[in-house]
C-alpha cells in the first residue's frame, strides 16, 4: 500500500512538471501585450474565475497586489449581482477559465465592452469565446490532467498559478518594484521589520542615553555605565558632538592598569568609536555592530550630534535578526 501511494504521488508530480515545462515556450506577443496593458492600467486589475480557477485567481490577485499592482478578486456570480459596479473603465479584468466558455461570460463580456474595460484571458482554449473577446490570451492548456480519471483540475491549475506568477513577476520587474516597496505592503511581517525600521525608530532616547561630558571623570562615566546598563557611555563636547566612547572594556583595562577614578574620562575613553546614523536602516546598522563585534553604539544625527543609543537587543526585540 505504501509503495502504491508513493508511486501515485510521484506520478502526479511528474505529470504536472511535464505540463508546466511547456509554458515558457508559449510566452510571446500576447504575454507582452497583457503585461503592458497592466503596466499602463490607471485603475486596478480585477481578477475573476469560477471553481478552481477562482481559487487560483484569488492567489494571483493577492500576488499582484503585494508586488506593486493594485488588484482584487471578484467572483463572476457576485459580479452579475451588483459587483460589476466595482469595476471602472480605467480597470483591467483578468478572467480565468480553462474552457473559456463559462456561461457567466455571456453576460459579463458585454458589460465590460460597454465600459471599455480591457479584458485579458487566461484559458486552455485560446479560440473559445473568452479567448476571442480578450485583448491578450495567456495559454494554460495541458495535454492531460494529473488526475487518474483526467477530471480533477490538477496540471491545469498548476499551469494557471505559474502563468499568474510569471505575469506578476514580469510586471513587478518592469515597475522597478524593490525590497523596500515590498516591505511597505507587508509592514507587520519580518521583512517589514527588517526593511522599514530606521535606527531612530528603535533607539533609546532622552534619559536612557548613556552620556557624559568631556570634562567628566572616569568615576562619572562608571556611574553612568551602571545607571543605563548599555555597556558604553558616549563622551560628548559642549555641542553634543560625540568625541569618543567609554565602554565596560575600557573601564576594566583602566582599573587593571592602575588608573585613578578621578582622571578625566577623555584619557581613558576610546577616541572616535563607532556611531550610527539615526536615519540609517536598522538592518544596516545591526550589520555594522555585528561586523565590528560590538554590542552597542551611540546614535547621531546628520550633523554628528548625539540623539540616542542602541544595542543589539533593541534590534532583536524589533524582529531584526
Swiss-Prot record:
Where substrate binds, per the record, is at: 68-69, 75, 81, 107-116, 141-143, 215, 267
Record carries keyword ATP-binding: yes
**What InterPro entries does the entry give?**
CBS_dom, CBS_dom_sf, GutQ/KpsF_isomerases, KdsD/KpsF-type, SIS_dom, SIS_dom_sf, SIS_Kpsf
Instruction: Give the main EC class.
Output: isomerase
Write the record's keywords in alphabetical order, separated by commas.
Answer: ATP-binding, CBS domain, Isomerase, Lipopolysaccharide biosynthesis, Metal-binding, Nucleotide-binding, Repeat, Zinc
- Asked if Nucleotide-binding is a keyword of the record, the answer is yes
Q: What is its EC number?
A: 5.3.1.13
| Signal peptide coordinates | none
One of this protein's GO BP terms? single-species biofilm formation
Annotated CBS domain ranges read: 203-261, 269-321
Q: Which CDD domains match?
A: CBS_pair_SIS_assoc, SIS_Kpsf
Q: Which domain of life is it from?
A: Bacteria
What does its pH dependence look like? Optimum pH is 8.25.
Q: What does this protein do?
A: Catalyzes the reversible aldol-ketol isomerization between D-ribulose 5-phosphate (Ru5P) and D-arabinose 5-phosphate (A5P). It appears that the physiological function of G-API may be to synthesize the regulatory molecule A5P, which in turn participates in the induction of the gut operon through an unknown mechanism. It is also able of sustaining the biosynthetic pathway of 3-deoxy-D-manno-octulosonate (KDO), a unique 8-carbon sugar component of lipopolysaccharides (LPSs).
Family recorded in the similarity comment: Belongs to the SIS family. GutQ/KpsF subfamily.
Subunit-level organization: Homotetramer.
What is the name of the protein in this document? Answer: Arabinose 5-phosphate isomerase GutQ
Q: Which gene encodes it?
A: gutQ
Amino acid at each position: 500500500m505504501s509503495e502504491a501511494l508513493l508511486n501515485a504521488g510521484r506520478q502526479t508530480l511528474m505529470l504536472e512538471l511535464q505540463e508546466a515545462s511547456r509554458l515558457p515556450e508559449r510566452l510571446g506577443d500576447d504575454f507582452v501585450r497583457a503585461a503592458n496593458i497592466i503596466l499602463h492600467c490607471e485603475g486596478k486589475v480585477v481578477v475573476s474565475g469560477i471553481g478552481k480557477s477562482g481559487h487560483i485567481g484569488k492567489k494571483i490577485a493577492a500576488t499582484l497586489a503585494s508586488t506593486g499592482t493594485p488588484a482584487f478578486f471578484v467572483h463572476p456570480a457576485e459580479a452579475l449581482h451588483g459587483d460589476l459596479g466595482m469595476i471602472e473603465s480605467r480597470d483591467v479584468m483578468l478572467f480565468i477559465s480553462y474552457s473559456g466558455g463559462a456561461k457567466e461570460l455571456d453576460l459579463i463580456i458585454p458589460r465590460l465592452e460597454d465600459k471599455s474595460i480591457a479584458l485579458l484571458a487566461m484559458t486552455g482554449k485560446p479560440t473559445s469565446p473568452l479567448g476571442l473577446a480578450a485583448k491578450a490570451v495567456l495559454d494554460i492548456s495541458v495535454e492531460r490532467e494529473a488526475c487518474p480519471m483526467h477530471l480533477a483540475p490538477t496540471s491545469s491549475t498548476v499551469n494557471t498559478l505559474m502563468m499568474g506568477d510569471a505575469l506578476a513577476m514580469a510586471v513587478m520587474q518592469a515597475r522597478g518594484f524593490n525590497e523596500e516597496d515590498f516591505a511597505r505592503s507587508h509592514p507587520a511581517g519580518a521583512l517589514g521589520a527588517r526593511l522599514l525600521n530606521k535606527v531612530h525608530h528603535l533607539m533609546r532616547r532622552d534619559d536612557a542615553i548613556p552620556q557624559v561630558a568631556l570634562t567628566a571623570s572616569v568615576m562619572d562615566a562608571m556611574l553612568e555605565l551602571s545607571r543605563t546598563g548599555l555597556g558604553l557611555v558616549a563622551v560628548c563636547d559642549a555641542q553634543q558632538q560625540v568625541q569618543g566612547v567609554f565602554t565596560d572594556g575600557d573601564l576594566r583595562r583602566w582599573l587593571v592598569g592602575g588608573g585613578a577614578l578621578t582622571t578625566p574620562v577623555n584619557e581613558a575613553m576610546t577616541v572616535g568609536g563607532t556611531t550610527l546614523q539615526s536615519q540609517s536602516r536598522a538592518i544596516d546598522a545591526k550589520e555594522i555592530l555585528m561586523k565590528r563585534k560590538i554590542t552597542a553604539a551611540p546614535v547621531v544625527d546628520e550633523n554628528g550630534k548625539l540623539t540616542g543609543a542602541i544595542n543589539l537587543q533593541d534590534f532583536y526585540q524589533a524582529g531584526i535578526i
